[in-house]
Amino acid sequence: QVYLAAEIIVATKTHKMHAAWVRAKPEHLAAAELFMDADMAILATPQPRLSEYDAQISREWGQTPGLESFEFCSGRFNALRGFKTAGPVFMTTEFQELDSAAQANIDHLMDFWQHRLTVLNRELVTVAKTASP
């Protein structure tokens, strides 16, 4: 059971179970999908909580919210884009009603991080111009 829990927790990084694990443990797939959907449910929360969650992610990665590095902003945007292009956020019927809210929030977060990248890019260009002779 500990192995099962560990595998499911690791899967939350990509929100996909490894095919070999699914073949070996098909009877646990429903539990794994439910766990991963519960992990993603934060994306369907109201904006204030969503912003708080996003700031927590920045801190988890050693960033100061509002002062994130270009690399972090780019990575965060790309992670969100990955969720967006993967299709529905939720795999289980228990969570599917939250999908439209989660998709809208992903769009909101992508807009936020795209804006941060634009601002940082302008700052980098300004610094580069002032540094050149």
Features from the language model and the residues they span:
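Acidic/histidine metal-binding catalytic segments
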Residues: 1-11
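Divalent metal-dependent phosphate-bond-processing catalytic cores, especially two-metal-ion Mg2+/Mn2+ enzymes
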Residues: 14-133
